[in-house]
Amino acid sequence: MSQLSKNLGDSSPPAEAPKPPVYSRPTVLMRAPPASSRAPPVPWDPPPIDLQASLAAWQAPQPAWEAPQGQLPAPVVPMTQPPALGGPIVPAPPLGGPMGKPPTPGVLMVHPPPPGAPMAQPPTPGVLMVHPSAPGAPMAHPPPPGTPMSHPPPPGTPMAHPPPPGTPMAHPPPPGTPMVHPPPPGTPMAHPPPPGTPMAHPPPPGTPMAHPPPPGTPMAHPPPPGTPMAQPPAPGVLMAQPLTPGVLMVQPAAPGAPMVQPPPAAMMTQPQPSGAPMAKPPGPGVLMIHPPGARAPMTQPPASGAPMAQPAAPPAQPMAPPAQPMASWAPQAQPLILQIQSQVIRAPPQVPQGPQAPPAQLATPPGWQATSPGWQATQQGWQATPLTWQTTQVTWQAPAVTWQVPPPMRQGPPPIRPGPPPIRPGPPPVRQAPPLIRQAPPVIRQAPPVIRQAPPVIRQAPAVIRQAPPVIRQAPPVIRQAPPVIRQAPPLIRQAPPPIRPAPQVLATQPPLWQALPPPPPLRQAPQARLPAPQVQAAPQVPTAPPATQVPAAPPAGPQVPQPVLPAPLSAPLSAPQAVHCPSIIWQAPKGQPPVPHEIPTSMEFQEVQQTQALAWQAQKAPTHIWQPLPAQEAQRQAPPLVQLEQPFQGAPPSQKAVQIQLPPQQAQASGPQAEVPTLPLQPSWQAPPAVLQAQPGPPVAAANFPLGSAKSLMTPSGECRASSIDRRGSSKERRTSSKERRAPSKDRMIFAATFCAPKAVSAARAHLPAAWKNLPATPETFAPSSSVFPATSQFQPASLNAFKGPSAASETPKSLPYALQDPFACVEALPAVPWVPQPNMNASKASQAVPTFLMATAAAPQATATTQEASKTSVEPPRRSGKATRKKKHLEAQEDSRGHTLAFHDWQGPRPWENLNLSDWEVQSPIQVSGDWEHPNTPRGLSGWEGPSTSRILSGWEGPSASWALSAWEGPSTSRALGLSESPGSSLPVVVSEVASVSPGSSATQDNSKVEAQPLSPLDERANALVQFLLVKDQAKVPVQRSEMVKVILREYKDECLDIINRANNKLECAFGYQLKEIDTKNHAYIIINKLGYHTGNLVASYLDRPKFGLLMVVLSLIFMKGNCVREDLIFNFLFKLGLDVRETNGLFGNTKKLITEVFVRQKYLEYRRIPYTEPAEYEFLWGPRAFLETSKMLVLRFLAKLHKKDPQSWPFHYLEALAECEWEDTDEDEPDTGDSAHGPTSRPPPR
């Protein structure tokens, strides 16, 4: 079967012996364009089988099958006997012989044998045989003018490699020319196969043919499909590769040779006159193509593709109902291509043939209405056994197939031949495309080796880190390749820092928005994109002289803790040799004690915070996190460099106190893992001696001496919870160090070594560079702990930068930080989701780069952090997934990558906040106080409200000019907007952008009683987070978002869970941003985002439209409402003209006012603009659009109008009642559960304010 047919979805022939009849799609005949044309063949289907359709439309110019004057066709080399073909074949009668009705030139004719005529041994049923013309016999028709015709070389002449399909050839190889290899089954054989392929010579006219085996018997000479052809057809011969039953054989008849009669079941295009000499007809099912006379008059309309066959056979003989046209005859002098794409032939059913129709009927256009009942027979005859054609395109120029046709064949078919080959190669490329995609991840996995050399860059002198900021901006590519860095990080740390080598993968551009989403298997590739890029790149050095300053810590909003001014001693920049890698901030506090970050490699003081009694932490015991040594190989897989942090603190009150650390990195000294835990005296405040950071080549996880307690959960250096050797209550999953153990918590964790958003002035990005900290000059920055706490929502892990979900450690931690810090991320991972309150040095000069120091804000409320046990209980459970996703989306499961880190560290390939920072982002902007200023113009680049393993892409780089909207949303549903969020640019209130997995802030329950657990982030939630990001960005244009676009850009392979993900995204929008996703077009599934919190009067859409445009919109909406909810366009324009606004102006305040109203507002769905029916010329009217219904209300508009007129809204009683009714309905609608409102309540809207 031709490959062309395979492209169309047809079944391919059996690979071995012929099988029972297979019914495939009908023959598609290709109508060849003129030989001089390169246009592809035009497939056409025959008229319907009802045979009542007129063929008038199908008529084509009648080709004249005669050679140009004075030119005779070249003689053709006689063909030898092919193996195993039917009985003796008698040549057709000479041209001009007695033929009752001359057939149409170019029409395939099969003459039925007269009743009682001797039957030759029946060849394989369904074989189409055409006798070749005798050598020297005049061609029935010459090739198109200009076709070089030369005598084919004698059989056996070696043939050069045939030109590619479509290349005209001077002469075809003679039959029997050795061919190198035949094309695969289904390859159109329009062009001769390469030399070397043995070709059986078609038999010369009259050559007796061997008896074929019965139908279904495999034939000796034809190989099974896929093997080299034993008999590649000579040019002009249509031969199936295996001459199994149903093979078409075309042999040009020699002029003057008696025509072999076709079998009774043969499909006949012309009844043979009774006077024609009849030869022994071939067996049943053989289709004999007989050449018509050279200049036979046309008594029937030319069959332009529609088979005009008329069965003529004795009634006693069965005939095969021709279900498909046999050939399409092209216009004059162009090759006729018989394109059998998926032709299937089987032994024709024994259908008794009706009386022979008179030939005259063929002259009428409705030639399909042959009286013969055979034409109404079931469509079976030709659809039985699949024909495995090696040459699906047989091109001949005359019914008497001449061997000189190939030249035109190559000219005519080229359109056809180029067509199918592209089609055939097409599918293979398509099938090969997936492999390419599957190979993409390996490419990504190979990239990391380049980065393995990068860690040294990060473990270098402070100067290196000063260069990091630019590096961070260029992180995205580096991030994907970071994992290997982590794998070799500990060894690199133990070694002397190699010379800094700038990472080659420094991309200055940030990945575009949602396009940063990984490819469809994004979450599996994500593992390789979860590392802070800074570790891989070195940036230009920017030496800074950090001045010593004191930073008055501004009290955080929300639950607060007294925060005295913290003196920040100045520390000189580290010297390169002394620089050691200090992991990210890690805190450990006894249960009920404020978490105390202890690991800041710069000179920083952590001010102790006297918490208010209401928010006091009650230390009930001092459980510990015990770091169990891991196998060396496992530790090697873990990214964090091995850095021992010896706890030199003198102690701290077990409760209500945050420790103050002063860690000048330059004082790093070697200290063993046996750092003892000094007791924490109850001092109001104290200065801790410099912590000693040691990078030692000890075991990956050096056991440190901590106070052993009933730690509910232990952290592996990679940050996962492990079952404690003391407390064995954990499940077996918790006790495993296998990848399964790391797999579960990954999605649940929002860790990035300090990817905790901080104002730009705080140089938050640097805080995310754990490896770089050791090189940062310590600028005096103090961070007072903040007590602002946001309740966690079970189904929505907030996009706060530090929402540590899953195995985040709880307040049940050692009173001090004596354990060795193995992973800069593990440290952060061990933190519960408590707010980080960055309070940068406001007085630091611009020259000094703010040290990315963060203090783990001691959550003031007891419920601010979940216990380690609680937090880890869910962390070890695999994230919830739909069954379908679980089966299909294995790449979405949190799996252990080659470094032993869970994907949580580098779960998303999207831009990280540090990737967007330039050098200026790392500098304190000015002495102005920006300690809590999340509205800082450059803050968006320094923070990311969704920074989590699964949401780092959501808002990083997506924040608008003001990031407050991206941050204020992460208060829990019950938290007010004012809870620690300041939207004024100069605000000194630290913004708390984190959610604590705990009960609401109002609860005073202790941690033991707090059972709220952070749930793992399922793949659907990850997609929902990405969808939220996508929607927020798309909403800036105020244009509805199509569901199909969401699926294409974000959901991808999760389109089956599309509605579920959209609902989750809607819930996140409501909880986080106060927005709501509404479906405004249920037919096209278009969505918009509205402000669910409602707008204050006069502030309807001012956030998106400037005041003038907003006023114009309100005027138009109010006019529409007052005029009966529908106003003609001219009335609105006239009204605006009376107000002094000429809509024809294009340079006014609104620019093109008419375009603004009729296009922009309409596109944004504030207005609906429709034509008034039956108006000529067309007139249009305006109505409220769906967005107007959702974002405002009639009552608001009425109040707006009343305010303009200085009246009471009730001055318009009718409109007031209408607006009031709408308000009541909205109130009723709002009373329903919000979950039911989801994203599919196109008409629900918030109550008016």
Curated annotation (Swiss-Prot):
One of its GO terms (molecular function) is ubiquitin-protein transferase activity. Residues 1-50, 134-233, 300-327, 349-378, 410-433, 515-569, 647-679, 714-746, 862-910, 930-957, 1226-1249 are annotated as: Disordered. Keywords: Autism spectrum disorder, Biological rhythms, Cytoplasm, Endosome, Intellectual disability, Nucleus, Obesity, Repressor, Transcription, Transcription regulation, Transport, Ubl conjugation pathway. Residues 40-49, 140-233, 312-324, 349-358, 410-432, 553-567 have a biased composition (Pro residues). Residues 1226-1235 have a biased composition (Acidic residues). This is MAGE-like protein 2. Residues 725-746 have a biased composition (Basic and acidic residues). It holds the Pfam family MAGE. It comes from Homo sapiens. SMART domains: MAGE (SM01373). Part of a complex consisting of MAGEL2, TRIM27 and USP7; directly interacts with USP7. Interacts with TRIM27. Interacts with VPS35; leading to recruitment at retromer-containing endosomes. Interacts with BMAL1 and PER2. It is linked to Schaaf-Yang syndrome: A disease characterized by clinical features of Prader-Willi syndrome, including neonatal hypotonia with poor suck, feeding problems in infancy, obesity, developmental delay, short stature, and hypogonadism. Additionally, patients manifest autism spectrum disorder. Some patients have dysmorphic facial features. Gene3D superfamilies: MAGE homology domain, winged helix WH1 motif (1.10.10.1200), MAGE homology domain, winged helix WH2 motif (1.10.10.1210). Residues 881-891 have a biased composition (Basic residues). Probably enhances ubiquitin ligase activity of RING-type zinc finger-containing E3 ubiquitin-protein ligases, possibly through recruitment and/or stabilization of the Ubl-conjugating enzyme (E2) at the E3:substrate complex. Acts as a regulator of retrograde transport via its interaction with VPS35. Recruited to retromer-containing endosomes and promotes the formation of 'Lys-63'-linked polyubiquitin chains at 'Lys-220' of WASHC1 together with TRIM27, leading to promote endosomal F-actin assembly. One of its GO terms (cellular component) is nucleus. Expressed in placenta, fetal and adult brain. Not detected in heart and small intestine, very low levels in fibroblasts. Not expressed in brain of a Prader-Willi patient. Residues 1-10, 369-378 have a biased composition (Polar residues).
